[in-house]
């Protein structure tokens, strides 16, 4: 639903603060624990949830998210179960936007039309599919938009002025600026470079620009949130899950609470990065 996403960003703009966008891996380390994490995210201050779709060959992800995907797959997580996670979450939360993030192969195998219908029924608001370039928009992007599901595109430091309009052409919901080249979990980029990149993208679109890669602490969220419409945190959350598990990768009574504690701190940082509210 594009309306839920648009409403959330409008509310945040009125409040004069950036969104805190939190990523976690669906099914890590098991279904019930990941549902508990998902429910805890908004309560801890997350404004938008990115729901990871586990995949056996996640080429753009760093070691932490790769391991999270492996734990989820080992626990029996499937794309169908990841959609069910969203549906179960929606039973008690109809306000927080959910963006599914992952790779095209599981969606292709599931069936594009069936996936989009099931995603819509589960309350999914947007998709980020990292290995589908704009040249393949007819595969999933255009059908998703026709169904009313946002298709969020990634921009990087190497997305130049010539390429940017192509990247943004069918993008909706928000633009996800990957603040450095490489895999997820890298170090925090230079804030001045991030600010310049956000302004450059905004010259080409009216969509919100959210920045990810390298954000791990409340201070990071505050610094990056000072120039962006949203701050995306993924690896830090996935690591928090991992460190709470038993030696054999099972959840403990502390797993959900450990994530909630981290997100509360990140939320505090993001909320202190005051943006200029709309007149």
Swiss-Prot record:
CDD domains per UniProt: Tryptophan_synthase_alpha
Gene Ontology CC annotation, any one: cytosol
Keyword annotations of the record: Amino-acid biosynthesis, Aromatic amino acid biosynthesis, Lyase, Tryptophan biosynthesis
InterPro entries reported in the protein's UniProt record: Aldolase_TIM, RibuloseP-bd_barrel, Trp_synthase_alpha_AS, Trp_synthase_suA
Keyword Cell membrane: no
EC number of this enzyme: 4.2.1.20
Molecular function as annotated in GO: tryptophan synthase activity
Keyword Lyase: yes
Catalysed reactions, semicolon-separated: (1S,2R)-1-C-(indol-3-yl)glycerol 3-phosphate + L-serine = D-glyceraldehyde 3-phosphate + L-tryptophan + H2O
Pathway: Amino-acid biosynthesis; L-tryptophan biosynthesis; L-tryptophan from chorismate: step 5/5
Catalytic site positions: 50, 61
A Pfam entry, by short name: Trp_syntA
Family: Belongs to the TrpA family.
Function: The alpha subunit is responsible for the aldol cleavage of indoleglycerol phosphate to indole and glyceraldehyde 3-phosphate.
Assembly and oligomerization: Tetramer of two alpha and two beta chains.
Protein name per the record: Tryptophan synthase alpha chain
Species in which this protein is naturally found: Rhizobium etli (strain ATCC 51251 / DSM 11541 / JCM 21823 / NBRC 15573 / CFN 42)
Higher taxonomy: Bacteria, Pseudomonadati, Pseudomonadota, Alphaproteobacteria, Hyphomicrobiales
């Amino acid at each position: 639903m594009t309306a839920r996403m648009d409403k959330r960003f409008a509310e945040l703009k009125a409040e004069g603060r950036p969104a805190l966008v939190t990523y976690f891996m669906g099914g890590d380390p098991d279904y019930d624990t990941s549902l508990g994490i998902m429910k805890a995210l908004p309560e801890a201050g997350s404004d938008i949830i990115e729901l990871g779709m586990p995949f056996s060959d996640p080429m753009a992800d760093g070691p932490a998210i790769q391991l999270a995907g492996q734990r989820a797959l080992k626990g029996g997580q499937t794309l169908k179960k990841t959609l069910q996670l969203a549906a179960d979450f929606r039973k008690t939360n109809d306000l927080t936007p959910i963006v599914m993030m992952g790779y095209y192969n599981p969606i292709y195998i599931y069936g594009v039309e069936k996936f989009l219908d099931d995603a819509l029924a589960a309350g999914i608001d947007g998709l980020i599919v990292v290995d589908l370039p704009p040249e393949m928009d007819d595969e999933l992007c255009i059908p998703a938009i026709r169904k009313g599901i946002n298709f969020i595109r990634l921009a990087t430091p190497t997305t130049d002025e010539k390429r940017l309009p192509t990247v943004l052409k069918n993008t909706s919901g928000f633009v996800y600026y990957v603040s450095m080249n490489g895999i997820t979990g890298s170090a925090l980029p230079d804030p001045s470079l991030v600010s310049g990149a956000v302004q450059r993208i905004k010259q080409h679109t009216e969509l919100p620009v959210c920045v990810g890669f390298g954000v791990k602490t409340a201070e990071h969220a505050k610094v990056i949130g000072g120039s962006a419409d949203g701050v995306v945190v993924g690896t830090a959350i996935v690591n928090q899950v991992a460190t709470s598990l038993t030696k054999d990768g099972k959840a403990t009574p502390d797993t959900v609470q450990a994530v909630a504690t981290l997100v509360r701190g990140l939320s505090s940082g993001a909320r202190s990065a005051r943006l200029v509210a709309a007149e």
